[in-house]
Amino acid sequence: MARRLLLVLVVALATAAGAQARVDADPLAPQEWWLSHVGADRVAAPGPGVPIAIVDSGTDPTHEEFATRPSTTFLNDQTTFGRDEWHGTFVASIAAAPDNGVLIDGVYPQAALQVFDASTTPITGITDFTVVAAITAITQHCPAVINLSFGGTDPDPNLQDVLLGAMRSGCLIVAAAGNNGDEGSPVSYPASWPHVVAVGATDQNDVSVSFSTVGPWLDLAAPGKDMIGAVPHWRNANGYSVESGTSFAAPIVAAAAAWVWTVRPTLTASQLSALLRASARDVGPAGFDNATGWGIVDIPAALAAPTPPNDPSEPNDDISQVKPGVLFADGQAPVTRAAKPSIRLAATLEASDDPRDVYRIWVPAKRYVRVSAVSGGNAAARIWGPKAVGVREGLAAQRRDLRGQRMYGGPHGSAAYVEVLLTGRSQNARYTLSVTAARK
């Protein structure tokens, strides 16, 4: 069934690339208060590099902010005449309106910008089917930062699988958290899925806006209230309006991510996601909170922060992601084998983005394998047998498949899986996994 996915709250209509400070030529740039709140005014943006890929309603190619914009690729035909089809133009302008002297500047004005119109018709709007097509197309050319300023409360497994494929191919996914904070904050998808950077909205006082959906899956916050952006001229005669929503916080984070990735091109998508969280400007309660995640994205801090440890096996949250022929044809290679039955490896977990890791192992014939995760008490490891299909199996299947920390290989040896998961209320963990083979 087609589902409308657009996230927007209408407020009003209005008639290291160097350490140098940014200079904006556009007349309304001084009124774009959000630029200073994310540090975009304190450093000069780089030229085009890792692209920002906007999947949304159409972006108006005739608008003065985009008609002659360099480094802009329209990945399909754009339509902007439906009731909600101003949204993509606004989102794209927040991220990457050029410094062309017209009126406004995006967070990353020189960005390589890609736009995909995921609206099917003015009536049905953006649907899971069209988003899957968009992500599939963009994934062919990772790395990119994919911005999804939409969502819904009904998860689509097909969309999740495609997003996991994009992440595996080297793209970073950024999504709006949702605008249902005043309605109990129901879980929103795709924002709440692992490996998606979920973004909530803050105001000029760095306070979470009441409409911004909150939850333990939130990663970051960014300005999203009273934003000035471009719209098709049918929406407003002067081509601009003032809007609010997490839809407009997400492209700020997407632009920041593309900026940092362009300056620090050796980062993986997982490292970039971790870097943005670690360098965020903490607001609200100290540390992580459900309203602002790890804090407001901070571009200068992300440019300067140490490189996080790499987590090269992602995504590996479940058996289906590592077993060949299930989600991915090649799956993941076993971390142990008959010739090397013992191993130590280091990786990370994070509650909202990467809550568990699963590895394929080989248990040698007539030997036992033991597993442990050393992390200061924040993570634990356990073994699943060869017939397990997932780490969330029902109780009956668990009794058959869950082996604890020790497993015997039998007369011929056996495939198995090791799950490492966060314990208690831990938000993150840096762990060392030990897989040790022995006769007893």
Positions of PLM-derived features:
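Substrate-binding/access-modulating region of protease and related hydrolase catalytic domains
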Residues: 48, 115-195, 205-208, 214, ...
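Bacterial N-terminal signal peptides
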Residues: 7-14
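Hydrolase catalytic cores
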Residues: 92-95, 114-119, 144-145, 224-296, ...
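Subtilisin-like peptidase catalytic core
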Residues: 50, 57, 70, 74-155, ...
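Acidic, Ser/Thr/Pro-rich low-complexity intrinsically disordered segments
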Residues: 155, 292, 341-432, 436-440
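C-terminal subdomain of the subtilisin-like protease fold in secreted/lumenal serine endopeptidases
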Residues: 21-24, 39, 65, 134, ...
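N-terminal domain-start motif of subtilase-like serine proteases
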Residues: 22-52, 74-86, 298
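Bacterial N-terminal signal peptides that target proteins for export
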Residues: 1-6
